[in-house]
């Protein structure tokens, strides 16, 4: 938890950190990823058979090794909008017998050469857990139940045996399943009203948990601030109505929300993720309201928020229909750092967050035929995933605030926009970690710092300007490491992310 006192521009900024004041446990799943059959994410990204850089499975070895550096706990698959017309059965069995299908989300052709078993093999090599999204467009409940049976079944049943026939004896035990993707959107095949979706989602959830009670089901929300979110939570945050169950545990475990941010200039761009912080706060209250109105006993688990699509994305700059290949700037990297600060600050409410996406498509990692490029946004992801774990701890920031235009405009009315955006954690290893984003593109911030004990390791991500970017053969934004004695004031460079780390006493 970070609190803020607004100062005049003439007053001296300060940050105080209290490592002994633990606020909430951070779920490591806030550093989750996302791979969709879109653009070059799968084909030409993680899967590129015939490329000299690929292994015997067709998986790009350089991509696997790079993503291991991010220590990604969960990866969402296969979409995204793609799921609304995807039939999982097309993507299993001998590849020469798999049908090619028209793909309606991005208007391509899906070969189905990469499907459930390939993805699971890739996850095992990466050391990550899968999160599957069900087809709520053209899919059926029977099809969804069959997919769960194929993945998790242990009995002598048809789809469990089909998995065994396809070479996998043991069940995959896939835990996380989403009840559709952005079903509210007019771009979706088989878009629904909130009333239609809530009825269908509850019935599917009931059946899925009868088949496998261990599943964690994720409800399809909107952006956390819409009537869709309230209505679907109210209708679906209920226990199963079944003669076989007297449980009072809600069928729904998490509520999904999506948001992408961008701004036409640096300061609206870098402050835009504060809209997500307000959306999390509103969604959290809607979850509480649904539990109260539905009479869910207080001893039952409280659903958390699954922010399973987030990133900086300007669709005009990187059109989805053309593969959404963003070229990220330092400004975007600082915005991603603030996104991550938000998830740390709101760790009590956020159970998972999936950056969209993990390779090539609005991604920190780009592939070429002969290598990879770590974009500017790679570095905040790397630092946060490596160090910002454990518990959120108390920090207080006193500094001036940006008072100009924001994107969206309503941020100005509901959130402070300090020049220094901060989150703080205490790791299992006993180290305190403080992430500070100086959003100013003009001014270094000399800041009184209280709470550091002993020598401080300092990691800095910055560049010559907010427009600096990384491309093949030219890395303008990277990571530097230094030390500080932890005494007095620290100067946070303009347009930078700084992570301070020390052994707490």
Swiss-Prot record:
Primary subcellular site in the record, as a coarse category: secreted
Enzyme class (EC, first level): hydrolase
Catalytic activity reported: Hydrolysis of terminal non-reducing alpha-L-arabinofuranoside residues in alpha-L-arabinosides
Assigned keywords, A-Z: Carbohydrate metabolism, Glycoprotein, Glycosidase, Hydrolase, Polysaccharide degradation, Secreted, Signal
UniProt cross-references to SMART domains, sorted A to Z: Alpha-L-AF_C
GO biological process: arabinan catabolic process; L-arabinose metabolic process; polysaccharide catabolic process
Subcellular location: Secreted
Protein's pathway: Glycan metabolism; L-arabinan degradation
GO cellular component: extracellular region
Annotated disulfide bonds: none
Name by which UniProt lists this protein: Probable alpha-L-arabinofuranosidase C
């Amino acid at each position: 938890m970070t609190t803020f006192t607004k100062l005049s521009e003439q007053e001296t900024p300060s940050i105080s950190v209290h490592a002994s004041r633990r606020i909430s446990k951070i779920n490591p799943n806030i550093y989750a990823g996302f791979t969709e059959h879109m653009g070059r994410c799968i084909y030409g990204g993680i899967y590129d058979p015939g490329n000299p850089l690929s292994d015997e499975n067709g998986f790009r070895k350089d991509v696997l090794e790079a993503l291991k550096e991010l220590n990604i706990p969960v990866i969402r698959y296969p979409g995204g909008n793609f799921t609304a017309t995807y039939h999982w059965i097309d993507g299993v069995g001998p590849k020469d017998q798999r049908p090619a299908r028209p793909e309606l989300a991005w208007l391509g052709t899906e070969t189905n050469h990469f499907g459930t078993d390939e993805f699971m093999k890739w996850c095992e090599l990466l050391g990550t857990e899968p999160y599957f999204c069900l087809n709520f467009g053209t899919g059926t409940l029977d099809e969804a139940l069959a997919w769960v049976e194929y993945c998790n079944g242990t009995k002598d049943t048809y789809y469990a045996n089909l998995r065994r026939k396809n070479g996998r004896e043991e069940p995959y035990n896939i835990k996380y399943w989403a009840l559709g993707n952005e079903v509210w959107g007019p771009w979706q095949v088989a878009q629904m009203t909130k009333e239609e979706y809530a009825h269908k989602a509850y019935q599917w959830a009931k059946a899925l948990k009868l088949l496998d009670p261990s599943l964690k089901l994720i409800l399809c929300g909107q952006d956390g601030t819409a009537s869709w979110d309230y209505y679907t939570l109210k209708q679906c945050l209920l226990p199963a109505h079944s003669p076989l169950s007297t449980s009072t545990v809600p069928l729904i475990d998490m509520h999904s929300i999506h948001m992408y941010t961008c701004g036409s200039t640096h300061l609206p761009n870098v402050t835009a993720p504060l809209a997500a912080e307000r959306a999390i706060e509103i969604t959290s209250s809607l979850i509480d309201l649904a539990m109260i109105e539905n009479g869910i006993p207080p001893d039952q688990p409280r659903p958390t928020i699954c922010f399973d699509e987030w990133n900086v994305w300007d669709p005009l700059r990187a059109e989805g229909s053309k593969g959404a290949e963003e070229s990220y700037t330092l400004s975007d990297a600082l915005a991603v750092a603030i996104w991550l600060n938000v998830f740390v600050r709101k760790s009590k409410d956020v159970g998972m967050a999936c950056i969209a996406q993990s390779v090539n498509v609005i991604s920190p990692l780009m592939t070429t035929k002969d290598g990879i490029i770590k974009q500017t946004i790679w570095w905040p992801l790397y630092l946060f995933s490596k160090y910002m774990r454990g518990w959120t701890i108390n920090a207080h920031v006193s500094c001036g605030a940006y008072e100009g235009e924001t994107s969206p405009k309503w941020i100005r009315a509901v959130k402070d926009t300090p020049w220094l955006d901060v989150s703080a954690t205490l790791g299992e290893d006993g180290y305190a970690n403080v992430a500070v984003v100086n959003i100013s593109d003009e001014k270094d911030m000399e800041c009184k710092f209280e709470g550091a004990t002993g020598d401080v390791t300092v990691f800095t991500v910055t560049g010559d300007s907010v427009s600096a970017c990384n491309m093949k053969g030219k890395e303008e934004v990277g990571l530097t490491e230094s030390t500080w004695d932890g005494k007095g004031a620290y100067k946070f460079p303009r347009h930078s992310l700084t992570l301070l780390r020390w052994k707490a006493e």
